[in-house]
């Protein structure tokens, strides 16, 4: 079920609507220049506050600031006695009209003496605390050419944008009577509540924070900041980036975390501070281990690739796996155990692991080989291992790998989340595919992100990555281990920073979709291989280990297998072989 929120326009007045060709309705976001024109038409509304949904005239800023001070003092004065005299049925119809809203809050805190007290039966009525319908952001469509945006929200039980009931102990210290101080960046941040009410329970007073409204403003601020960056309006982008941080605080769960990482990435792009050491192998390996434990994505990648490799090795006596993504070797114990159980006996297994150099120049690939060697001793598999350190797969040469004739040894090439890194260097992917063809593999297994983060237009890349990583973070919320989840979020946060903040050779996350990879690989002389139905069934069983598989979806896509969260595919496994007309060029 999808709902379009037509009140997301940055101005509180009824927004102008435009119909898209597919019938969807877009809300006019406007650009910086249009905001200025709108401000003049709206009687001098403050530009920055208007784009974030607050209706304040520039001439009224001093009055609003004075009302904020009055409200602050009033709230501090009633801390000892609580806020029980507030009328629970008061409705602030337009909190975006900041001046009027503050006036109503002040009036309610200091009611005239003649006002009647609420009836006890009314004080017992807690219907205003009924939970709102839960929703989460799972799709964002943005078209900068039309200068419009459509913010689409889908229902999900994994994220919470309900009204938050916060007890007084969460706001005021029981031992100290502290004075509330609004942020110096924006005085209105402190008063992002939609209503203030009271009851006769022991947890009085209760303040309701409308995190759903703030969530809407948060997404709008992210999109507006990205557009300002694209237009090189850095002053506006800087102000919006700071605003994003304040709005993110009011959110819970995945939305707050995603917004925080994207805010950092935008700040780095604004100030031109690219993250250091994007290829820090030791850190990436450690974070990837936690990602492996907290979610099924890497397990799915290894499992489906191993299934295709196992079928390709059927009946072979000597096999050779060339792994472009060795890391900690987590993929291979399961395959070795499966080969050991073959009715005809295990083949002789040769493994060549390729990885980037370690920052401390340690021989981590050799350590991985020793661990695997200890494993094969227990399962009686003949094992041979060699590790290669390479700054890039494009530096690889087939002559380095000591290849043996195909009649003697069957070769398989495996790549998990590695090929997209080659797209930063012109001609690199073509060179690697040429080397792979010289290896004459039985099969090449490829696992990549199902996302297009490689477009030339920054807004397109930002919108797609915001959608993609919001879905990924949403799926991680079901992880039972908080430490694994936190480290997994850092693992994905590094990717977000690289996608958004970096350009050129500094950017390594050049993700593309299966359709794009199919075009690339077919043009390089490869043909797709259909992954068997056994892989599909067993991958579906794997998901039962993660929250009974709820939310995760395995789908078949033209012979490839995708794993996604609800309706969004996130990673894809495909298998390839040399085409019949493929020409192998040796150097």
Swiss-Prot record:
The DELLA motif is required for its GA-induced degradation. Probable transcriptional regulator that acts as a repressor of the gibberellin (GA) signaling pathway. Probably acts by participating in large multiprotein complexes that represses transcription of GA-inducible genes. Upon GA application, it is degraded by the proteasome, allowing the GA signaling pathway. The lineage of its organism: Eukaryota, Viridiplantae, Streptophyta, Embryophyta, Tracheophyta. Signal peptide: none annotated. Belongs to the GRAS family. DELLA subfamily. Keywords: Gibberellin signaling pathway, Nucleus, Phosphoprotein, Repressor, Transcription, Transcription regulation, Ubl conjugation. It comes from Cucurbita maxima (Pumpkin). InterPro entries: DELLA_N_sf, TF_DELLA_N, TF_GRAS. Phosphorylated. Ubiquitinated. Upon GA application it is ubiquitinated, leading to its subsequent degradation. Residues 367-399 are annotated as: Leucine repeat II (LRII). Residues 411-498 are annotated as: PFYRE. One of its GO terms (biological process) is gibberellic acid mediated signaling pathway. A motif (LXXLL motif) lies at residues 419-423. Residues 288-353 are annotated as: VHIID. This is DELLA protein GAIP-B.
């Amino acid at each position: 079920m999808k709902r379009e929120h037509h009140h997301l326009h940055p101005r509180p007045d009824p927004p102008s609507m435009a119909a898209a060709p597919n019938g969807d309705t877009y809300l006019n976001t406007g650009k910086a220049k249009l905001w200025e024109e709108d401000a003049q038409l709206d009687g001098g509304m403050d530009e920055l506050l208007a784009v974030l949904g607050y209706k304040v005239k520039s001439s009224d800023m001093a009055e609003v600031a004075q009302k904020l001070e009055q409200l602050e003092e009033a709230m501090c004065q009633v801390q000892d006695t609580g806020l029980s005299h507030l009328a629970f049925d008061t409705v602030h119809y337009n909190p975006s009209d900041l001046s009027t809203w503050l006036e109503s809050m002040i009036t309610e805190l200091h009611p005239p003496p003649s006002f009647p007290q609420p009836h006890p039966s009314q004080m017992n009525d807690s219907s205003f605390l009924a939970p709102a319908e839960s929703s989460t952001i799972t799709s964002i469509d943005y078209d900068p050419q039309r200068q419009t945006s459509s913010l689409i929200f889908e229902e999900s039980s994994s994220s919470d944008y309900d009204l938050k009931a916060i007890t007084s102990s969460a706001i005021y210290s029981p031992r100290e009577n502290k004075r509330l101080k609004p942020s110096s960046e924006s005085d209105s941040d402190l008063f992002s509540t939609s209503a203030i009410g009271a009851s006769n329970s022991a947890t009085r007073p209760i303040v309701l924070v409308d995190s759903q409204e703030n969530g809407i403003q948060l997404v709008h601020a992210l999109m507006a900041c990205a557009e300002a960056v694209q237009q090189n309006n850095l002053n506006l982008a800087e102000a919006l980036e700071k605003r994003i941080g304040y709005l993110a605080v009011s959110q819970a769960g995945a939305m707050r975390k995603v917004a925080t990482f994207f805010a950092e990435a935008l700040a780095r792009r604004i100030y031109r501070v690219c993250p250091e050491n994007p290829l820090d192998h030791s850190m990436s390996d450690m974070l990837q281990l936690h990602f492996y434990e907290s979610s099924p994505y890497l397990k799915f990648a290894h499992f489906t690739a191993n299934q295709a490799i196992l079928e390709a090795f059927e009946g072979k006596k000597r096999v050779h796996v060339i792994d472009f993504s060795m890391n900690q070797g987590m993929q291979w114990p399961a395959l070795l155990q499966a080969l050991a159980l073959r009715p005809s006996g295990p083949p002789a297994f040769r493994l060549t692991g390729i990885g980037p150099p370690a920052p401390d120049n340690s021989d981590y690939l050799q350590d991985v080989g020793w661990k695997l060697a200890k494993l094969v001793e227990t399962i009686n598999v003949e094992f041979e291992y060699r590790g290669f350190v390479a700054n890039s797969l494009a530096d690889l040469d087939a002559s380095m790998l000591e290849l043996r004739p195909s009649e003697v040894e069957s070769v398989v090439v495996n790549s998990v989340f590695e090929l997209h890194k080659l797209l930063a260097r012109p001609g690199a992917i073509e060179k690697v595919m040429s080397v792979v063809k010289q290896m004459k593999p039985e099969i090449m297994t490829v696992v990549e992100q199902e996302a297009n983060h490689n477009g030339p237009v920054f807004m397109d890349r930002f919108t797609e990555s915001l959608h993609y990583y919001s879905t990924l973070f949403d799926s991680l919320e079901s992880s039972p281990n908080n430490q694994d989840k936190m480290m997994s979020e850092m693992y994905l946060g590094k990717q977000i920073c690289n996608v958004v903040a970096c350009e050129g050779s500094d950017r390594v996350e050049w993700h593309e979709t299966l359709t794009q990879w199919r075009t690339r690989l077919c043009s390089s002389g490869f043909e797709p291989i259909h992954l068997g139905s056994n892989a599909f069934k067993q991958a579906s069983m794997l998901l039962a280990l993660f929250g009974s598989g709820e939310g995760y979806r395995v789908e078949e896509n033209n012979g490839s297998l995708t794993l996604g969260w609800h309706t969004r595919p996130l990673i894809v496994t495909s298998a390839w072989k040399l085409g019949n007309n493929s020409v192998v060029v040796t150097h």
